[in-house]
Regions:
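C-terminal motif of bacterial Sec signal peptides marking the signal peptidase cleavage site
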Residues: 17-20
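Positively charged n-region of N-terminal signal peptides that target proteins for export
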Residues: 1-5
């Protein structure tokens, strides 16, 4: 009888342990508009709220690359001044205790979160908590600024690099899926491509934005589409390229691609393509250049940040848009990323 009791107790403990190891991905309820918080991060590590008030200066921050959120928590990747590897959570530094084989400078180009895991892109590795996952054939690979996304435990990384199969000296668009490398397709005759934007969802699905030759482009499920521009090529003179996609998202089965195109005065114009149709997003102030930096969907709403630059000075303004309407302007705040809590 005693042995039966011990066996039953051990079995119960085993069930408890197994149950505690099977974590479901957290699902956060969509907050009503009035309860949401928009946070913006600058390259130097200042965190601002939607009203433009300074929330916090990230401690020991040399460079802040990206900000994401999960529920009421926010996470920032970048470069820590003391050379440590990790991230900021709600403004406090968290060190990842990772044993590196290579002595390299640590610069994180992206951050992702799934379940209880934090992913950091620290070339040539992806760090998953304290685990190290080496990117396949990473030589000559150039990551995008926001190069990493995770969906239900599947990790994606984007950028561009050279192809040994077609060694013509031109960059090709690169996608890593769980650290395995592939070059994305381009139209016949195209010579160069770059990936700059990434959105992953439902584990196996991706939308990627960037440029093919001199035109803005999007890859949906790895199939390319060249996006149209407003200004005909013959009016633009000898520009290196016509436009580029910098950020992508999906909302209610519509694909949103934010970036810029050039006009006939050779000015960058902040542009949003919705299902491939371009529209310009300008605040009304006379500016020398503008671009859409980042776009994200929250529930049924779409938020976007644009930046406008004025003349030869360093003056700039960031603008927050909600569903196509300008809702806030930030004077002389340079934004490297934003998120919605």
């Amino acid at each position: 009888m005693r042995y039966l009791f011990v066996y039953a107790l051990l079995a119960a403990c085993a069930v408890t342990l197994l149950s505690s190891c099977e974590h479901d991905e957290p699902v956060n309820p969509i907050k009503p508009l009035e309860d949401r918080t928009v946070l913006l991060v600058t390259p130097s590590g200042e965190i601002y709220d939607q009203n433009g008030d300074l929330v916090q200066q990230l401690p020991n921050c040399t460079f802040a690359a990206e900000i994401i959120s999960d529920g009421d928590d926010y996470f920032v990747s970048g470069v820590q001044s003391k050379g440590r590897v990790g991230y900021w959570k709600n403004g406090k530094w968290n060190t990842l205790h990772v044993d590196f084989i290579d002595d390299v400078d640590h610069w994180t180009y992206g951050i992702g979160k799934w379940d209880y895991y934090i992913y950091l892109l620290d070339i040539p590795n992806v760090l998953k908590n304290s685990g190290i996952f080496r990117l396949e054939d990473f030589h000559d690979f150039v990551p995008a600024q926001h190069a990493l996304a995770v969906s239900e435990g599947k990790c994606y990384v984007i950028g561009y690099g050279f192809s040994d199969i077609d060694p013509d000296g031109h960059y090709k668009p690169v996608l890593y899926t769980n650290y395995k490398k592939e070059f994305l397709p381009m139209p016949e005759g195209a010579t160069e491509g770059e990936c700059h934007a990434l959105y992953a969802y439902d584990r196996d699905h991706t939308i990627i934005g960037g440029i093919i030759d001199d035109m803005p482009a999007v890859w949906v499920e790895k199939q390319y589409e060249i996006y149209p521009v407003t200004y005909p090529r013959e009016t633009l003179g000898n520009l290196n390229f016509i436009g580029r996609v910098e950020s992508v998202t999906k909302c209610n089965d519509h694909i949103y691609a934010a970036g810029f195109e050039f006009n006939y005065d050779n000015k960058m114009i902040a542009t949003l393509w919705i299902d491939g149709v371009p529209s310009h997003y300008l605040s009304g102030w006379e500016c020398s250049n503008s671009q859409a930096l980042e776009i994200l969907a929250y529930g049924d709403d779409v938020y976007m940040i644009t930046t406008e630059y004025y003349g030869a000075t360093d003056e700039s303004r960031a603008h927050l848009w909600l569903n196509g309407k300008l809702i806030k302007t930030y004077n002389n705040i340079q934004v490297s990323g934003f998120t919605v809590l």
